[in-house]
From Swiss-Prot:
It is found in: Cell inner membrane. GO terms for cellular component: plasma membrane; proton-transporting ATP synthase complex. It comes from Cupriavidus metallidurans (strain ATCC 43123 / DSM 2839 / NBRC 102507 / CH34) (Ralstonia metallidurans). It is a peripheral membrane protein. GO terms for molecular function: ATP binding; proton-transporting ATP synthase activity, rotational mechanism. Gene3D superfamilies: ATP synthase delta/epsilon subunit, C-terminal domain, F0F1 ATP synthase delta/epsilon subunit, N-terminal. The keyword Transit peptide does not apply. NCBIfam families: ATP_synt_epsi, PRK00571.1-4. Produces ATP from ADP in the presence of a proton gradient across the membrane. Its main location: membrane. This is ATP synthase epsilon chain.
Amino acid sequence: MATILVDVVSAEASIFSGQAKFVALPGESGELGILPGHTPLITRIQPGAVRIEKEDGGEEFVFVAGGILEVQPQHVTVLADTAIRGTDLDEAKASEAKRAAEEMLQNQSSDLDLARAQSELAVAAAQLAAIARLRRKK
């Protein structure tokens, strides 16, 4: 079966690099599915789970806090603002971040505070959703 090279990188590290049969990730307008031979594309991605169906049939999950996706017919590159392997996600930490962002929303004093709180809340909620999705796969 045809495969596509997938690289998921953040400013800190390369999180995943390998051959895959399929990649699904959160785009601006909804979930994107990428197969080998996909039309070239550059777009922003939203906070959420990147699901990589590997060549051997296994799956890899990576949480991204947004970033840029570049697709070429035989290569997918995810340049993430922040990327965390699914196995390294911390539910307690994500829940606390969500609670703190909700509190910040209640106490915001400027448009900048509001935008920051909304952004942090979106990332925390997406991280919790990714954790729940990963649990369902186990």
